[in-house]
Design a protein with these regions (language model features):
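Hydrophobic, aromatic-enriched alpha-helical segments typical of multi-pass transmembrane helices
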Residues: 1-178
Length: 178
């Protein structure tokens, strides 16, 4: 049990990415099929939050010296903010769009700064996902209304690029890293 909690960054980030991809696929399929997960959705949200934090915290070591130290330290800060915003929104209907607007900029930055670390297709997916996050969460934050509807096909594109850019890209980069 101790080994699970005290593992190296690479292994922890890989496990977080697998969980992130799995939870997002479950949500994506459930959304398309209009499934109601009930209270299990709270469990999925918890796993999603922890997996996303694991991915974000691992980016510091994955990117290494390709980004400045203040950027690397910023990953811990955004991971904490995303975790708090995500978990606060589990049982309460809170407006967390401000935090996720900022997170959209972080995803965009990940795509732009990870050249040579994450393969281009996954970097571009992160850039697209970041732009979607900025537009969707930003419009909700500024106007109170998201310009991308919840049941819009364009939201599926944003979600798939989010899974690819934030989940698959770093996972494959970690798999290649010695």
């Amino acid at each position: 049990m101790k080994k699970f909690f005290i593992q190296d960054v690479k292994e922890g980030s890989q496990q977080a990415a697998y969980m992130f991809i799995a939870v997002n696929v479950v949500w994506l399929v459930g959304g398309i099929a209009e499934l109601d997960y009930g209270n299990f959705d709270n469990v999925l949200q918890l796993f999603w939050s922890f997996s996303l934090v694991g991915i974000i915290l691992g980016l510091k070591d994955l990117q290494g010296d390709t980004v400045p130290e203040d950027w690397r330290q910023g990953y811990a800060m955004i991971a904490a903010a995303v975790l708090v915003a995500s978990l606060l929104g589990v049982n309460e209907d809170l407006n967390t769009s401000g935090v996720f607007t900022f997170f959209g900029f972080v995803i965009l930055g990940l795509g732009v700064t990870s050249e040579g670390v994450i393969d281009n297709i996954w970097r571009y997916a992160a850039i697209i996902a970041g732009l979607f996050g900025i537009v969707a969460a930003g419009s909700q934050f500024i106007t109170g209304t998201s310009i991308i509807a919840d049941d819009s096909p364009i939201q599926i594109v944003g979600w798939v690029t989010f899974i690819a850019g934030v989940g698959i890209g770093p996972l494959l980069a970690w798999n290649k890293k010695e």
